[in-house]
From Swiss-Prot:
Gene3D superfamilies: 6.10.140.720
Record-level GO cellular component terms: host cell cytoplasm; host cell nucleus
Organism: Influenza A virus (strain A/USA:Iowa/1943 H1N1)
Keyword Transferase: yes
Protein's job: RNA-dependent RNA polymerase which is responsible for replication and transcription of virus RNA segments. The transcription of viral mRNAs occurs by a unique mechanism called cap-snatching. 5' methylated caps of cellular mRNAs are cleaved after 10-13 nucleotides by PA. In turn, these short capped RNAs are used as primers by PB1 for transcription of viral mRNAs. During virus replication, PB1 initiates RNA synthesis and copy vRNA into complementary RNA (cRNA) which in turn serves as a template for the production of more vRNAs.
GO terms classed as biological process: DNA-templated transcription; symbiont-mediated suppression of host gene expression; symbiont-mediated suppression of host mRNA transcription via inhibition of RNA polymerase II activity; viral RNA genome replication; viral transcription
Protein name: RNA-directed RNA polymerase catalytic subunit
Protein EC: 2.7.7.48
Length: 757
């Protein structure tokens, strides 16, 4: 789809065409190679912003650490991370004064969450640094490995299944003199193939035990692995993002829970809400400033940009904030919340894979792993890389760089928002004690500032005061990138405000089209996206109709399912034509079986199977919705499925779509090539977890089951459930006596086997 006809029909005035300037059509840029360079940039920049702080050495790991807190006040406009503790605490106190009880209430809410959260909360999320294997893994696997290692080292509090107990193990693990872990490795040997008589490389996977002393373990526990952020639009340079290990994640989760609870109560916070709710919140703040500035005052709005928000934040400052917010709370709760910032003050950044060298003349390629950067001869590197390595060398320990100041991207979005809002809160007249006052919006590092004053001098004074207040808290408003307008026109988190929010339609462009999950899901997602944009993004009826036609065309080309009466020849057309001729009611065929499209903008909310059900031939219905069809590996489908949409801006969104299980809801099989690598051991573990979980869910089909509380194991829970179900089925005559006896016998056998084990 190279045309973008949507823009012709949007019911928009000219200023809304802002969306056409966004870099959102076409594929986003991806990074290739290693992120080592970007990570070194981050580490070096962060230290540069705090360079006038105090150096200390961590007694446990020997890592050099820079502490900029309460450092010299800035004399110029350069970004700096010298936040002043007393200023931060005062800002918190004023925030509490204007929102009585806010911290108290949020602490109470959070305490409940802390006591109820299960450890499987940590399985959510994508790639996670797995400290046992020293590389990234899916979150569930990384958690399983961590728990396995903990148990084999005598840490068993986690067996209760509560997250807080797992965190007790984490704390204890840090006091241990050594930790024993299992690592995977592979052996290669050359053997002759019996059939082809050629030499082949045979790989076997081995597991071996390895002991980590206290120092090595601590370094791993405090390590954040780094990667390059992919698919970032509108930027020339890539940047590094971090993924923390399992030791840090649980603590961060609780801190963010508290901060989220506070943000929900702050009218200036753009988190944790999104979409239309966020727009309503923003519109309220703007309305308040406009109504109060009608006659005597003028009002201006800054579309703000902060320089390197994360790299100037400081975990020590977050510790001060948490200490203040939880000051009347029980000791255990304060301790749990203070661990995350303490760990971040001692964090280590893993430098990634290292550098790739190739010699054109000798056709050689070699990888220099990050561990070698500490003592390799720098003559092989170009100037810029050489400077980076020289700068970072004093900070290196075992291929990781000590990074005490700064926060990595996305770790404490909610908490840093609270910090930002505390400055916006200081703009009330009772605090500025002068003729100007301000208010605004904050969402992580993005902000909009609305300043009111009797005249232009007042506006200027207000902005200056805001700028200087920010500096005291380690926030650096960029004078180059922020711009000011009469209130009524600004941008905040890619929402454009012009006397009301303008639909920034181009943001949604990437989600139009065929997702590539399977025929059933893709059809459903495609029409849902169009429906959602009619509701939320000013997609007009004419355009929606056109988008729908383009989508159906795109869909047919993707799955080669052109209508049965078409002339287009594809690999599938022979089968589709045969089906077309055999079918009495051709309107009943799904589009993916060569049927006509019955969707229009009025019925987008109805799944295609339901839309056509009454029109289908009976035998077609039978084939389409037959769970015993041997050609389809079925996934149990809830009535609502979630697709992960990648919007142009911000994190991946979950989008719900209606799912009707048919023979088109197939799941592709896993690629085989992974089976020959050292990942294989991990893959087998993962499949085992998968099987256990699937089995468990068969016994407890409702997705809302209460987890078995207490000490009963999964097996015991399933056996007792099987017995109850069997008895009910037998008594209601659904199963015969023989079947009932057999089920009971199997249950007893399972219990017997468990006892013997």
């Amino acid at each position: 789809m190279d045309v973008n006809p949507t823009l012709l029909f949007l019911k928009v005035p000219a200023q809304n065409a802002i969306s056409t300037t966004f870099p959102y059509t076409g594929d986003p840029p991806y990074s290739h190679g290693t992120g080592t360079g970007y990570t070194m940039d981050t580490v070096n920049r962060t230290h540069q912003y705090s360079e006038r702080g105090r150096w200390t050495t961590n007694t446990e790991t020997g890592a050099p650490q820079l502490n900029p807190i309460d450092g010299p006040l800035p004399e110029d406009n350069e970004p700096s991370g010298y936040a002043q503790t007393d200023c931060v605490l005062e800002a918190m106190a004023f925030l509490e004064e204007s929102h009585p009880g806010i911290f108290e209430n949020s602490c109470i809410e959070t305490m409940e969450v802390v006591q109820q959260t299960r450890v499987d909360k940590l399985t959510q999320g994508r790639q996670t640094y797995d400290w046992t294997l020293n590389r990234n893994q899916p979150a569930a696997t990384a958690l399983a490995n961590t728990i396995e290692v903990f148990r084999s080292n005598g840490l068993t509090a986690n067996e209760s299944g509560r997250l807080i107990d797992f965190l007790k193990d984490v704390m204890e693990s840090m006091d241990k003199e050594e930790m024993e872990i299992t690592t995977h490795f592979q052996r290669k040997r050359r053997v002759r193939d019996n059939v082809t008589k050629k030499m082949v490389t045979q790989r076997t996977i081995g597991k071996r035990k390895q002991r980590l002393n206290k120092r090595s373990y601590l370094i791993r526990a405090l390590t954040l692995n780094t990667m390059t952020k992919d698919a970032e639009r509108g930027k020339l340079k890539r940047r590094a993002i971090a993924t923390p290990g399992m030791q840090i994640r649980g603590f961060v989760y609780f801190v963010e829970t508290l901060a989220r609870s506070i943000c929900e109560k702050l009218e200036q916070s753009g988190l944790p809400v999104g979409g239309n709710e966020k727009k309503a919140k923003l519109a309220n703040v703007v309305r308040k400033m406009m109504t109060n500035s009608q006659d005597t005052e003028i009002s201006f709005t800054i579309t703000g940009d902060n320089t390197k928000w994360n790299e100037n934040q400081n975990p020590r400052m977050f510790l001060a904030m948490i200490t203040y917010m939880t000051r009347n709370q029980p000791e255990w709760f304060r301790n749990v919340l203070s661990i995350a910032p303490i760990m971040f003050s001692n964090k280590m950044a893993r430098l990634g894979k290292g550098y790739m060298f190739e010699s054109k003349s000798m056709k050689l390629r070699t990888q220099i792993p990050a561990e070698m950067l500490a003592n390799i001869d720098l003559k092989y590197f170009n100037d810029s890389t050489r400077k980076k390595i020289e700068k970072i060398r004093p900070l290196l320990i075992d291929g990781t760089a000590s990074l005490s100041p700064g926060m990595m991207m996305g770790m404490f979005n909610m908490l840093s928002t609270v910090l930002g809002v505390s400055i916006l809160n200081l703009g009330q007249k009772r605090y500025t004690k002068t003729t100007y006052w301000w208010d605004g919006l904050q969402s992580s590092d993005d902000f909009a500032l609305i300043v009111n004053a009797p005249n232009h001098e007042g506006i200027q004074a207000g902005v200056d005061r805001f700028y200087r207040t920010c500096k005291l808290l380690g926030i650096n408003m960029s004078k180059k990138k922020s711009y000011i307008n009469r209130t009524g026109t600004f941008e905040f988190t890619s929402f454009f405000y012009r006397y009301g929010f303008v639909a920034n339609f181009s943001m949604e462009l990437p989600s139009f089209g065929v997702s590539g999950i399977n025929e059933s899901a893709d059809m459903s997602i495609g029409v849902t996206v169009i429906k959602n944009n009619m509701i939320n993004n000013d997609l007009g009826p004419a355009t929606a109709q056109m988008a729908l036609q383009l989508f159906i065309k795109d869909y047919r080309y993707t799955y080669r399912c052109h209508r049965g009466d078409t002339q287009i020849q594809t690999r599938r057309s022979f089968e589709i034509k045969k089906l077309w001729e055999q079918t009495r009611s051709k309107a009943g065929l799904l589009v993916s079986d060569g049927g006509p499209n019955l969707f229009n903008i009025r019925n987008l909310h109805i799944p295609e199977v339901c839309l056509k059900w009454e029109l289908m031939d009976e035998d077609y219905q039978g084939r389409l919705c037959n769970p015993l069809n041997p050609f389809v590996s079925h996934k149990e489908i809830e009535s609502v499925n979630n697709a992960v949409m990648m919007p142009a801006h911000g994190p991946a969104k979950n989008m719900e779509y209606d799912a009707v299980a048919t023979t088109h809801s197939w799941i592709p099989k896993r690629n085989r090539s992974i089976l020959n690598t050292s990942q294989r051991g991990i893959l087998e573990d993962e499949q085992m977890y998968q099987r256990c979980c699937n089995l468990f869910e068969k016994f407890f089909p409702s997705s809302s089951y209460r987890r078995p509380v207490g000490i009963s194991s999964m097996v015991e829970a399933m056996v007792s459930r099987a017995r109850i179900d069997a008895r009910i089925d037998f008594e209601s005559g659904r199963i015969k006596k023989e079947e009932f006896t057999e089920i009971m016998k199997i249950c007893s056998t399972i219990e017997e086997l468990r006892r013997q084990k």
